[in-house]
């Protein structure tokens, strides 16, 4: 086991604080409408330019192991805030730095760290409750647009796109962010259920000008196995031909003579057919086939439940108003499924989202909800260079998470004002069990001014003057650093999602409280590589002596 380096008391805390400040100072320059960018060097490729707090935090690793421990703990604050609300990472870092600095001053003055932490926890709990009281619902498109604009670093086009996307696909719909091909940002909305499987043969194409297959009022045959024998399909094909409607086959695969016969029948015009592979893999494939069945009022032909393809009838087939297939995607528009059954299926998937612990599974389940509930919107980010594209994509992603958080828990006045107001409201009535807890309460409430002060500092103004003016105001009165004007923050469109502000404060206080109560730090002693190299060199010289 490697030897350890151990530091105690003030020695440990000074080192830890240095690490906290290095990381927080790098992150906090990005805060607010006039926040600056940070350039991150990469081991390969061009450097990344970002204004996203968590991206900056993740890149920082310090040489001194004790300082690095402090930095890593603040990195955890930014990371947790990002996981919970998708935004507010810089605010969380600034709050953590302020609480740690104030708290360690009190510890150095001889206060009991445990009582300080209890005081901080009381203050945070009271302020979180007050934030809920100050919060107002975020319902109108205008408010959604304002939240998106602020979070995308005052980029109003991004705010508009997110607002339009939410209008089109609903607040629960899936909105994804992709690289665009031009200089402008674009919004692409796919209505109906789309999945990433294209036609199995180009001979199915009936619209050569767009290289797509379009089927009007088709039947849908859903099968959870491979089809290679055409005999299994004959009864269904005959029934569909009599009905005079087209047929879409969605199966694990269609191959061999079955695919060849379908192509020949289509080309001769005997029956209009197209075939695609079922989306997903394994259990997810079965679940998605079931989703399509509910959407189109069909049945999945599965041997697991004792159904055979040869015995399938028209009653087992789903129906939709229209299906469009290209080489990569299949879109089912207006399935005839029962509304109540679709809602029941959506509720069931939502329950699975609640119970799931994997982010990947949650994302896939959320996509299934959106496909059942009405559509998917894609924001295509345009930029002149790849470096700008990455930076912009980060901002659009943040804005998207912020608007979702706003819809979920409502909005409060932005620009750091909500925390200042909530802190002022609870300050008079909040008391600890002893004097040291009172000091903890006061330092936590004082630290809640830090985001406002940092926004003002980044805008090149005097933080103390603005903070004093904002504290003397009432309600949503605050300072718009973008226009350098005082006024009602909500009327000026400076909004923050309540969830983002709340998460930032809770995670910052949680980690900062632990750091204040630290008395000892243990790390591995650095290996003395020079000594090892010296020994190796001496051995080599000895060998040369022998040769002479």
UniProtKB/Swiss-Prot annotation:
What CDD domains does the record tag this protein with? GroEL (cd03344)
Q: What is its EC number?
A: 5.6.1.7
Question: Which Gene Ontology MF annotations are present?
Answer: ATP binding; ATP-dependent protein folding chaperone; isomerase activity; unfolded protein binding
Swiss-Prot/TrEMBL GO biological process terms: protein refolding
Coiled-coil blocks:
none
Question: Record's Gene Ontology CC terms?
Answer: cytoplasm
Reaction(s) catalysed by this chain, per the record, are: ATP + H2O + a folded polypeptide = ADP + phosphate + an unfolded polypeptide
Function summary: Together with its co-chaperonin GroES, plays an essential role in assisting protein folding. The GroEL-GroES system forms a nano-cage that allows encapsulation of the non-native substrate proteins and provides a physical environment optimized to promote and accelerate protein folding.
The Swiss-Prot or TrEMBL record describes its family as follows: Belongs to the chaperonin (HSP60) family.
On assembly, the entry states: Forms a cylinder of 14 subunits composed of two heptameric rings stacked back-to-back. Interacts with the co-chaperonin GroES.
* The name this protein goes by in its record: Chaperonin GroEL
* Source species of the chain: Haemophilus influenzae (strain PittGG)
The organism that produces this protein has a lineage beginning with:
Bacteria, Pseudomonadati, Pseudomonadota, Gammaproteobacteria, Pasteurellales
């Amino acid at each position: 086991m490697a030897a350890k380096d151990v530091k105690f008391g003030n020695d440990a805390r000074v080192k830890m604080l240095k690490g906290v400040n290095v990381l927080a100072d790098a992150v906090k320059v990005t805060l607010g409408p006039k926040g600056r960018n940070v350039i991150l060097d990469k081991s390969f490729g061009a450097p990344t330019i970002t204004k996203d707090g968590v991206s900056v935090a993740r890149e920082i690793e310090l040489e001194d192991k004790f300082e690095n421990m402090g930095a890593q703990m603040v990195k955890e604050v930014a990371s947790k805030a990002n996981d919970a609300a998708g935004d507010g990472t810089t605010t969380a870092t600034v709050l953590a730095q302020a609480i740690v600095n104030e708290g360690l001053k009190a510890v150095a003055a001889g206060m009991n760290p445990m009582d300080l932490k209890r005081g901080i926890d009381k203050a945070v709990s009271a302020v979180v409750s007050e934030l809920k009281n100050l919060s107002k619902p975020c319902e109108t498109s205008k408010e959604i647009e304002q939240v998106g604009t602020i979070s995308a670093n005052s980029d109003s086009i991004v705010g508009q796109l997110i607002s339009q996307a939410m209008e089109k696909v609903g607040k629960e719909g899936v909105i994804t962010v992709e690289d665009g091909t031009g200089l402008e940002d674009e919004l692409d909305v796919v209505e109906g259920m789309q999945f990433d499987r294209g036609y199995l043969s180009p001979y199915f194409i009936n619209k050569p000008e767009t290289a797509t297959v379009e089927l009007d009022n088709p039947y849908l045959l859903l099968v959870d196995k491979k089809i290679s024998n055409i005999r299994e399909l004959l009864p269904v094909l005959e029934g569909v031909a009599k009905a005079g409607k087209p047929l879409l086959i969605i199966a694990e695969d269609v191959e061999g003579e079955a695919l060849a016969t379908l192509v020949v029948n289509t080309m001769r015009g005997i029956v209009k057919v197209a075939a695609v592979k079922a989306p997903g893999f394994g259990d997810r494939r079965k679940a998605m086939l079931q989703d399509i069945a509910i959407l189109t009022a069909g049945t999945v032909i599965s041997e697991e439940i004792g159904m055979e393809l040869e015995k399938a009838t028209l009653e087992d087939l789903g129906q939709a108003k229209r299906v469009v297939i290209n080489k990569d995607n299949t879109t089912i528009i207006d399935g005839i499924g029962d509304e109540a059954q679709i809602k029941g299926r959506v509720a069931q998937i939502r329950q699975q989202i609640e119970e799931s612990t994997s982010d990947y599974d949650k994302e896939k389940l959320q996509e299934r909800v959106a496909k059942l509930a009405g559509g998917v919107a894609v924001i295509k980010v345009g930029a002149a260079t790849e470096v700008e594209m990455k930076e912009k994509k980060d901002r659009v992603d943040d804005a998207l998470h912020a608007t979702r958080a706003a819809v979920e828990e409502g909005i409060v006045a932005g620009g750091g004002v909500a925390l200042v107001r909530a802190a002022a409201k609870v300050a008079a009535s909040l008391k600890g069990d002893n004097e040291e807890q009172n000091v903890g309460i006061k330092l936590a409430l004082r630290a809640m001014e830090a985001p406002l002060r940092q926004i003002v500092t980044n805008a090149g103004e005097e933080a103390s003057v603005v903070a004093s003016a904002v504290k003397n105001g009432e309600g949503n009165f605050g300072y718009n650093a973008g226009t350098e004007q005082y006024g009602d923050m909500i009327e000026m469109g400076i909004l923050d999602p309540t969830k983002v502000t709340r998460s930032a404060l809770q995670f910052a206080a949680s980690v900062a409280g632990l750091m204040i109560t630290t008395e000892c730090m243990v790390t591995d002693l650095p290996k003395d590589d020079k000594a090892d190299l010296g020994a190796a060199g001496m051995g080599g010289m000895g060998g040369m002596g022998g040769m002479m």
